[in-house]
């Protein structure tokens, strides 16, 4: 199976505007993410950006980028526009990496890709154990509740995503990396945003409505 990694990015981020172009060791954050994705060696990588400045920066630093529209409600919608523009016919999976995570673990990328292929899943994401119970009440740390206890060799159905929780059983820190089959990506963006998704600012809740997502 062939995987394409698409990294959505924009300058007008809510928490820290302009973050993709902030420099770490003389290289922009978005270019760091691009290079980490390349190092995972799972397939081609491209940045999907709504700002020409981001496109120019990525290309200047040896990467690939495509300009998208500015009116997307989520990063996944931006990814789908980029995928359609590329007109690639031989791609099976789309890997979605967050454009503001320069220290993303390369092993996480390869592990998710491997699990998607071996389990023939429609959509997958990652989670890690919560080490500090204070994180359960931290709205900046997204949590996921799974149907079954997780281990590194097993995918489980996601039951819920949330920002605050008092639950302890089968609850994990959600890692914001996704992989979809191309058919699932299309189905996902064609769904209307749910009230739950909008109120919680978590687009992955849309996937729960179709029972698509596994951890």
Residue spans of the language-model regions?
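Residues that scaffold the ATP/ADP-binding catalytic core of kinase and kinase-like folds
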Residues: 57, 82, 187-188, 207
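Short phosphate-binding loop-to-helix
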Residues: 46, 52-111
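Conserved core of the sugar-phosphate nucleotidyltransferase
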Residues: 105-194
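N-terminal glycine-rich phosphate-binding loop and ensuing alpha1 helix
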Residues: 2-49
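A C-terminal functional module that forms or caps the active site or interfaces directly
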Residues: 189-210
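Short, structured coil segments at secondary-structure junctions
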Residues: 41, 61-62, 210
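Residues that recognize and position ribonucleotide moieties
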Residues: 14, 102, 178, 200
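Conserved small/polar residues in nucleotide/adenosyl-binding loops
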Residues: 213-215
